[in-house]
Amino acid sequence: MTVGIYEQQDFTGGLNLRADQFQLAENESPKMLNVDVDPRGGVFTRGGYTAINSTVIPSWNPHRLFRFDGDAPQIMLSNSTKVYRSTGSNFSTLQFSSGNDIAIGSSFGAGFAQWGKTLFISTGTSGNGGYKYESANTYASALTANGPTFQPYVSPTGGFMPCAKHLAVHANKMFAANTIENSVAFPNRVRWSHDSLPEDYMTDDYLDVEGGGNGITGLVVVSGQLIIFKPRAIFVLFGYNSASFQIVELSNRLGINTPRSVAQSDVGMYFFSYPEGFHYYDGSSIKNIFNQLQPIMDLNYLDITTKPVDVSWVNSRVWFAVPYSVTGTAATKATVNFVYDPSINAAGTYTMFQSSDSYGLLGGINWENSSGVSFGLMCHANIGRVVSVDNYEEQQDNLTGTASNFTTYYRTKWFDAGSYIQKKMFRRPDFVLKEPDAATTITVDVYHNFDEADGNQRRTFNLTLTPDPTAMAWGTGVWGTGVWGAGAASAVVVTGSNLGLARCVQLQFSGELGKKWGINSIGYKFQSRRVKG
């Protein structure tokens, strides 16, 4: 009897949660956790998370991190009530005088905008004009709130800024939105400073954006455009001065509820609109990128009434932190990250990450320390730690000073060799696996005939891998006088056990805790049985 073979070498479709398994592409997965997608085709264990601060930040309710490139690089953090700063390790509160912390009065947290080597901070507190801060200074300097006092063009004085909830630098001006002027709230107002003078504002230099619900919820600059978010609309400010500024509606359906739900990338912005999902804007059009994850909304796996969906752009990928739960009990904090890589495939690729203590990460930035070393930094959703991500040399998370293991698995789509009608005897498959740097075991669960419920696997076997002592391993091998870099140098072929008689099969690979692993290819072997009428 002829033995058929099929080799799967492409896994770049990533995670796709659509309920109908027949819609999955050959390179997509219905279930994966803490594995990264290799652009060249394989999957492998994600990098570890490592906390940068040994001292826990108190009263933890993080909003966002901000990269401040002043005289010395600093990490700024907006909590629910205070502003913190760090040079790469522990955090301290930012004060405006000895013993006086900057207080935040906005539910959105602090607004940050860098102008030259100066950081401007809005607090959203009535009567407070915000602060300016330089990294060389011990304290921030208070600014006087605009309204009732404004500065004519002919006599700028400096030292002023509107009381606002959002800040952005655009067209050589400082923009402030959702303002409070002389104790009167103007939630739909956008003000801008004099040209080149971020501390002076003219009385009539503002626009009120009334459509899309009450209150401006975010400002982002994309491709020379100032994007103004409302709860149910998105607007674009075109022009370059008070005489030419005009508002154009980009969408009257999409919007955000908090600035945490939008992140600026290198060439555009990503945002979450409820209930429409994740979207991307490149300066010309809005693209829906939520198709692969639509069931999480349809099945009510997200509860954003307790926590917003947080969006970060870290290490050239989008990290969507969501309160995700499939148990029927609403999650009160971000439990996972759906990580989207726009560089893989035309539609981009998703995977799902979760920390070793079962939480997501949020408020992320790309940051570079004074030595020029780059880090992807994010806030832990539950404990007062800021962590670096994508540490591929680490096999565990270190969130509290002690390393801890995280769960990893990857499940294939159903494989039916072209026909689910015909039964097949699935023989021993071959696997091309990434060679480990330490002995490890991968557990393979085999499911039959579209019965994919957890615990219903028909067979289970192990793939045992040991590093080749004669092979040149990255980081340890020396060739002549040159020492090689980091990472596994090769792959190994391992044969599994029979998969059994079935119409179709599905495999789930689960890695050993605390060990790296990866798959480059799956080679199926099968013998088709005669079809009975």
PLM features per residue range, with description:
Residues 48-62, 92-106, 143-308, 351-354:
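Beta-propeller and closely related beta-pinwheel folds
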Residues 107-153:
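Hydrophobic or amphipathic alpha-helical targeting/insertion segments
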Residues 116-120, 124, 129-131, 161-162, ...:
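A short, charged
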